Amino acid sequence: MIHRACPVLQLTIALLTLSVLHSNHAAASVSDPYTRVSETESGLVTLEMCERTLKPSAGEGPRIHLISAIHIADKQFYEAMQDRLELYDTVLFEGVKPAGLDAIDPELDDESKAEATRDRLELLLDISDQFHALNARLPEGIDDLMENSEPRIAAIVGSIRSDGWDQPIITSFVDTSISKNGEDKATQYITFTSTGADRQRDGTGVDADISLSSEPYSPNDRRKAAPEGIQTQLANALRVSFQLDEMDMTNPKWINADMDINELQEQLANMGEGDGMILDLIEGNSFQAKLMGFALKFVARSPTMSSMMKLVMMDMLALMESSEMLSQFEEIESVILHGRNNTVIDYLNKELAKDTQVEDIAIFYGAAHMPGLEETIIKDLGYEFESDTWTQAMAVSTEETGLSAGQIKMMRNMIKNALEQQF
């Protein structure tokens, strides 16, 4: 009997569908695949990701390496990717980012610089809130925020500590109190300030100070840290690693070549489909995410269920890339896949336009983005195929699933049939 695999199958289909919608939306492939699953006679199943190297047709310009990313994989995959990407001159990588993270172009007008500065102040407040949740205190300033945060967060803070006019952002605090149940309770809030276009305090118009303040915090205020996202919980359940936990993306030659969260949410909202729920689920904020997280904790406790789910997911990833099963999500696809691909190409064109001796540019993005990127780079930028290199991302022995060879074959057929019926 294979009925005991069905709950895992159903859960995996739900989770993988939502994860794919977030970053690796399936699309019709116009090129050879960027993922593949193979199995040895001994029952070892492996998922491999492709690095496709393109070279200029005319022989001039850098090579472009399209390197398939996957957000959860075995730790060894991320170690291999880290070593390989460090060899390249520039890396353009995937990751929907908070507003305010991009560099501010010094050629912008003052109004645009002011808007970009506000985004930075908002981001600093968000980071300070998470700092308080972890440390039960507010940071004493930007230096404290950097010194006592994990390297990835510290690098973000270091990149946004100046305003749009390249002046240091000022940190200040106000001590106050609120009345609660007839008692005064001491509170404090943090404020981040830019001195504006004139680089001096006060002023009017674009010269006016730009200040944003937090809500008041009390000394004993224990706020909850942000919930784990579905992808982190899925990684834990499958006993694999999460990309952001394993890879150091802070190299100055690495560029986050993706939309920011405000841009993505705005474009999704413009469709009128209420697609903010996708981001809430991936980030762990929705009720559905909490239910799935609860189920994943049970999977994580069972090595057999964990291995079974890992096998199912590997098959699904390869199957989704080679199919059009999610084609009815056409409007969402236009933003999550095609819109973000356009963003990558914009970043790539900026790098190609620079007068440098760059020899190799890597694009580290989800596999489903790659066929479209490859087509654009070949047709519009004058490139051609050079070579493929494959790297193992995940592996599982069928013996670890607790199923017989016949049951595993039946389960794989169930996956294919379930996807075809659902989509």
Predicted regions located by residue number:
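Hydrophobic, often amphipathic alpha-helical segments used for membrane interaction and targeting
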Residues: S42, P168, P216-D360, E375-T376, ...
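Acidic/histidine-rich, surface-exposed loop or edge segments in extracytoplasmic proteins
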Residues: E60-H71, L101-D109, E324-E331
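Zymogen propeptides
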Residues: S29-E94
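Low-complexity, acidic interaction segments enriched in glycine
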Residues: P106-E107, E111-R223
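A short acidic, amphipathic alpha-helical/loop segment
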Residues: Q76-R84, I104, Y347, T376
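Sec/Tat signal peptide C-region and signal peptidase I cleavage site
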Residues: H22-A28
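Bacterial N-terminal signal peptides
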Residues: Q10-V20
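Bacterial N-terminal signal peptides that target proteins for export
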Residues: M1-T12
